[in-house]
A protein has these predicted regions:
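GHKL-type ATPase core
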Residues: 1-104
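GHKL/Histidine-kinase-like ATPase module
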Residues: 59, 66-68, 74-207
Length: 207
């Protein structure tokens, strides 16, 4: 960044420091007492590094921050654009987490769920967590979005392939148990995924 300013409040004091192109231009300063807690970061992108543009696209930021609000249930994010004569502001807060993500996708695609309840599964192993939210709709296409540590894994990964494999196996086990399929028949992965919207999110500590 061309410049960056950081302000940290720890509940007793407020601290401030400024950097220019990665170098501190002044020492860390205690700017006074405060009961507030939190961190504020302001910066200006460096045109010498980002040669194509240093302009921020509001829709891109909104899409990314909304994604983060879905993936972290209860987080409150405010996106405010003050570049124009009329400020634009969006408040992002989803107590339903990735379940709300599935609802949002269905509304934006204009499709209708074919069962009322969004299926939600969560598991924890130490500090590692996994979440799945899924619901079938009246379309013929599937949409599986997977994330690792809040990063969209566009090329999939073991968390996504594992989910698909487990879902297909579970559907086949159920169908055979209740005689919905003959013993020599089975659903394919494509059969099981048709019309499915699913969010798979894992959060892993560093190995």
């Amino acid at each position: 960044s061309e410049w960056l300013e950081v302000e940290v409040c720890d509940g007793s004091a407020r601290y401030y420091q400024r950097f220019e192109r990665g170098v501190a231009v002044e020492p860390l300063k205690n700017t006074g007492p405060t009961e507030e807690k939190g961190t504020s970061v302001a910066f200006k992108a460096d045109a010498a590094i980002f040669e194509e543009t240093t302009e921020y696209d509001y829709d891109t930021l909104l899409r990314r921050l909304r994604e983060q609000a879905f993936l972290n249930a209860g987080v409150y994010i405010v996106l405010r654009d003050q570049r124009g004569t009329e400020p634009v502001e969006e408040h992002l807060h989803y107590e339903g987490g990735i379940r709300s993500f599935v609802e949002h996708i269905h509304k934006s695609k204009g499709v209708e769920p074919i069962h009322d309840e969004i299926i939600y599964l969560a598991a924890r192993d130490g500090d590692n967590t996994a979440e799945v939210a899924m619901q079938y709709n009246d379309s013929y296409t599937d949409l599986i979005l997977s994330f690792a540590n809040n990063i969209h894994t566009t090329d999939g990964g073991t968390h996504e392939s594992g989910f698909k494999t487990a879902l297909t196996r579970t559907m086949n086990d159920y169908a055979h148990k209740y005689k919905l399929l003959k013993d020599d028949e089975k659903f394919s992965g494509e059969d099981v995924l048709e019309g499915l919207t699913a969010i798979v999110s894992v959060k892993l500590t560093d190995a």
